[in-house]
Amino acid sequence: LTCVTSKSIFGITTEDCPDGQNLCFKRRHYVVPKIYDSTRGCAATCPIPENYDSIHCCKTDKCNE
């Protein structure tokens, strides 16, 4: 499985997930209204949202773009 780890105007960076991590995730952490910080990567289980986080998990290559 290949997941996106970062995304910018220059393109995307990906990583091949290690054995046992068969999910990609994208976490959006809301800093202030209309401004958020995104974290992407591989995971064994879908992370639990905290505070004002929004989390998307998926199981196909680069699905967390």
Curated annotation (Swiss-Prot):
Q: Which GO terms describe its cellular component?
A: extracellular region
Please tell me whether the keyword Secreted is annotated for this protein.
Answer: yes
Q: In which tissues is it expressed?
A: Expressed by the venom gland.
The effect annotated for residue 35 to M is:
In AncTx1; 2-4-fold increase in inhibition potency on ADRA1A and ADRA1D adrenergic receptors and 17-20-fold decrease in inhibition potency on ADRA1B and ADRA2C adrenergic receptors
Q: Which GO terms describe its molecular function?
A: toxin activity
Q: Which UniProt keywords apply?
A: Disulfide bond, G-protein coupled receptor impairing toxin, Pharmaceutical, Secreted, Toxin
Task: Quote the subcellular location field of this record.
Answer: Secreted
Q: What is the effect of changing residue 59 to G?
A: In AncTx1; 2-4-fold increase in inhibition potency on ADRA1A and ADRA1D adrenergic receptors and 17-20-fold decrease in inhibition potency on ADRA1B and ADRA2C adrenergic receptors
Q: What result follows from mutating residue 54 to V?
A: In AncTx1; 2-4-fold increase in inhibition potency on ADRA1A and ADRA1D adrenergic receptors and 17-20-fold decrease in inhibition potency on ADRA1B and ADRA2C adrenergic receptors
The record's disulfide annotation reads 3-24, 17-42, 46-57, 58-63
UniProt keyword Disulfide bond, yes or no: yes
Q: Look up the further comments and give them.
A: Negative results: does not show interaction with adrenergic receptors (ADRA2A, ADRA2B, ADRA2C, ADRB1, ADRB2), dopaminergic receptors (DRD1, DRD2, DRD3, DRD4, DRD5), histaminic receptors (HRH1, HRH3, HRH4), muscarinic receptors (CHRM1, CHRM2, CHRM3, CHRM4, CHRM5), and serotoninergic receptors (HTR1A, HTR2A, HTR2B, HTR2C, HTR5A, HTR6, HTR7). The analog AncTx1-W28R-I38S (which is not modified at position 28 and 38) shows a 10-, 740- and 5-fold increase in inhibition potency than the analog AncTx1 on alpha-1A, alpha-1D and alpha-2C adrenergic receptors, respectively, but is 2-fold less potent on alpha-1B adrenergic receptor.
Record-stated family: Belongs to the three-finger toxin family. Short-chain subfamily. Aminergic toxin sub-subfamily.
Q: What does this protein do?
A: Orthosteric antagonist of the alpha-1A adrenergic receptor (ADRA1A) with an affinity of 0.35 nM. Also has affinity for ADRA1B > ADRA2C > ADRA1D. Acts as a relaxant of smooth muscle. Reduces prostatic muscle tone as efficiently as tamsulosin (an antagonist presently used), but with fewer cardiovascular side effects.
Listed name of the protein: Toxin AdTx1
Q: Which organism is it from?
A: Dendroaspis angusticeps
